[in-house]
Amino acid sequence: MGRIIAIDYGRKRTGIAATDILQMIANGVATVPSGEVVKYLSDYISREPVDLFVVGLRKQMNNEPSENMKYVEAFVTHLKRTIPSIPVTYYDERFTSVLAHKAMLEGGLKKKKRQDKGLVDEISAVIILQAYLESKKYQL
Protein backbone atom coordinates (compact mmCIF):
# COMPACT_ATOMS: atom_id res chain seq x y z
CA MET A 1 0.00 0.00 0.00
CA GLY A 2 1.35 3.41 -0.93
CA ARG A 3 0.89 6.79 0.63
CA ILE A 4 -1.73 9.37 -0.32
CA ILE A 5 -0.36 12.85 -0.97
CA ALA A 6 -2.44 16.00 -0.46
CA ILE A 7 -1.55 19.17 -2.32
CA ASP A 8 -2.74 22.64 -1.30
CA TYR A 9 -1.69 24.41 -4.50
CA GLY A 10 -1.18 28.17 -4.44
CA ARG A 11 0.23 30.61 -6.95
CA LYS A 12 3.38 31.19 -4.86
CA ARG A 13 3.63 28.30 -2.41
CA THR A 14 2.19 24.81 -2.18
CA GLY A 15 1.61 22.84 0.99
CA ILE A 16 2.16 19.09 0.82
CA ALA A 17 0.99 16.41 3.25
CA ALA A 18 1.24 12.62 3.16
CA THR A 19 -0.35 9.70 4.91
CA ASP A 20 1.52 7.04 6.75
CA ILE A 21 2.01 3.81 4.81
CA LEU A 22 -1.30 2.43 6.20
CA GLN A 23 -3.16 5.51 4.91
CA MET A 24 -4.57 6.31 8.33
CA ILE A 25 -2.85 9.50 9.52
CA ALA A 26 -2.00 12.70 7.65
CA ASN A 27 1.30 14.47 8.33
CA GLY A 28 2.78 17.67 6.96
CA VAL A 29 5.66 17.07 4.58
CA ALA A 30 6.77 20.40 3.13
CA THR A 31 5.92 23.75 1.67
CA VAL A 32 7.41 24.09 -1.79
CA PRO A 33 7.58 27.01 -4.23
CA SER A 34 4.75 26.30 -6.68
CA GLY A 35 7.04 26.22 -9.70
CA GLU A 36 8.95 23.32 -8.12
CA VAL A 37 6.06 21.13 -6.95
CA VAL A 38 6.04 18.60 -9.79
CA LYS A 39 9.80 18.07 -9.47
CA TYR A 40 9.44 17.70 -5.70
CA LEU A 41 6.66 15.12 -6.16
CA SER A 42 8.68 13.25 -8.80
CA ASP A 43 11.58 13.01 -6.35
CA TYR A 44 9.23 11.98 -3.54
CA ILE A 45 7.67 9.11 -5.49
CA SER A 46 11.13 7.80 -6.37
CA ARG A 47 11.68 7.26 -2.60
CA GLU A 48 8.17 6.37 -1.39
CA PRO A 49 5.27 4.43 -2.92
CA VAL A 50 2.31 6.74 -3.64
CA ASP A 51 -1.19 5.57 -4.59
CA LEU A 52 -3.02 8.87 -5.06
CA PHE A 53 -2.68 12.64 -5.23
CA VAL A 54 -5.48 14.64 -3.57
CA VAL A 55 -5.56 18.25 -4.73
CA GLY A 56 -7.45 20.95 -2.86
CA LEU A 57 -10.54 21.99 -4.84
CA ARG A 58 -10.98 25.74 -4.65
CA LYS A 59 -14.66 26.65 -4.46
CA GLN A 60 -16.59 29.68 -3.36
CA MET A 61 -19.44 29.49 -0.87
CA ASN A 62 -21.97 29.23 -3.72
CA ASN A 63 -20.14 26.11 -5.02
CA GLU A 64 -18.73 27.97 -8.02
CA PRO A 65 -15.02 27.48 -8.76
CA SER A 66 -12.87 30.19 -7.23
CA GLU A 67 -10.85 32.61 -9.32
CA ASN A 68 -7.67 30.65 -8.56
CA MET A 69 -9.10 27.33 -9.75
CA LYS A 70 -7.72 27.94 -13.25
CA TYR A 71 -4.18 27.82 -11.80
CA VAL A 72 -4.98 24.62 -9.92
CA GLU A 73 -6.39 23.01 -13.07
CA ALA A 74 -3.28 23.98 -15.06
CA PHE A 75 -1.10 22.48 -12.33
CA VAL A 76 -3.14 19.24 -12.30
CA THR A 77 -2.86 18.95 -16.09
CA HIS A 78 0.92 19.31 -15.80
CA LEU A 79 1.04 16.82 -12.91
CA LYS A 80 -0.97 14.22 -14.84
CA ARG A 81 1.30 14.58 -17.87
CA THR A 82 4.47 14.33 -15.81
CA ILE A 83 3.36 11.54 -13.46
CA PRO A 84 0.63 9.66 -15.37
CA SER A 85 0.93 6.50 -13.25
CA ILE A 86 -0.63 8.09 -10.14
CA PRO A 87 -4.30 9.12 -10.21
CA VAL A 88 -5.35 12.60 -9.12
CA THR A 89 -8.56 13.51 -7.36
CA TYR A 90 -9.91 16.78 -5.96
CA TYR A 91 -11.19 17.42 -2.45
CA ASP A 92 -12.99 20.54 -1.21
CA GLU A 93 -10.57 22.85 0.57
CA ARG A 94 -12.96 25.54 1.76
CA PHE A 95 -12.05 26.89 5.20
CA THR A 96 -8.76 24.98 5.42
CA SER A 97 -6.73 28.17 5.92
CA VAL A 98 -9.09 29.28 8.68
CA LEU A 99 -8.85 25.86 10.31
CA ALA A 100 -5.06 25.91 9.95
CA HIS A 101 -4.83 29.28 11.74
CA LYS A 102 -7.15 28.00 14.46
CA ALA A 103 -5.06 24.84 14.92
CA MET A 104 -1.90 26.93 15.17
CA LEU A 105 -3.50 29.20 17.76
CA GLU A 106 -4.82 26.28 19.79
CA GLY A 107 -1.43 24.58 19.49
CA GLY A 108 0.17 27.52 21.26
CA LEU A 109 2.36 28.70 18.39
CA LYS A 110 3.77 32.17 18.85
CA LYS A 111 2.46 34.99 16.66
CA LYS A 112 5.55 35.08 14.44
CA LYS A 113 5.23 31.35 13.66
CA ARG A 114 1.47 31.72 13.00
CA GLN A 115 2.28 34.37 10.38
CA ASP A 116 4.44 31.88 8.43
CA LYS A 117 2.34 31.43 5.29
CA GLY A 118 4.31 28.35 4.31
CA LEU A 119 3.37 26.66 7.56
CA VAL A 120 -0.28 27.62 7.00
CA ASP A 121 -0.14 26.00 3.54
CA GLU A 122 1.39 22.81 4.92
CA ILE A 123 -1.18 22.58 7.73
CA SER A 124 -3.94 23.25 5.18
CA ALA A 125 -2.69 20.27 3.15
CA VAL A 126 -2.83 18.13 6.30
CA ILE A 127 -6.42 19.24 6.93
CA ILE A 128 -7.41 18.46 3.32
CA LEU A 129 -5.84 15.02 3.57
CA GLN A 130 -7.30 14.17 6.97
CA ALA A 131 -10.77 15.26 5.78
CA TYR A 132 -10.35 13.14 2.64
CA LEU A 133 -9.36 10.11 4.76
CA GLU A 134 -12.35 10.64 7.06
CA SER A 135 -14.72 10.86 4.08
CA LYS A 136 -13.41 7.55 2.72
CA LYS A 137 -13.70 5.84 6.11
CA TYR A 138 -17.45 6.46 6.17
CA GLN A 139 -17.93 5.20 2.61
CA LEU A 140 -16.83 1.67 3.53
Swiss-Prot record:
Keyword S-adenosyl-L-methionine: no
InterPro entries (alphabetical): RNaseH-like_sf, YqgF, YqgF/RNaseH-like_dom, YqgF/RNaseH-like_dom_sf
EC number in record: 3.1.-.-
Primary localization class, coarse: cytoplasm
Gene Ontology CC annotations of this record: cytosol
Keyword terms, alphabetized: Cytoplasm, Hydrolase, Nuclease, Ribosome biogenesis
Top-level taxon in the UniProt lineage: Bacteria
Location(s), subcellular: Cytoplasm
Gene Ontology molecular-function annotations: nuclease activity
Cell division is among the record's keywords: no
BP terms from Gene Ontology: rRNA 5'-end processing
SUPFAM superfamilies per UniProt: Ribonuclease H-like
Function: Could be a nuclease involved in processing of the 5'-end of pre-16S rRNA.
Family stated for the protein in its record: Belongs to the YqgF nuclease family.
Protein name per Swiss-Prot or TrEMBL: Putative pre-16S rRNA nuclease
Origin species: Parabacteroides distasonis (strain ATCC 8503 / DSM 20701 / CIP 104284 / JCM 5825 / NCTC 11152)
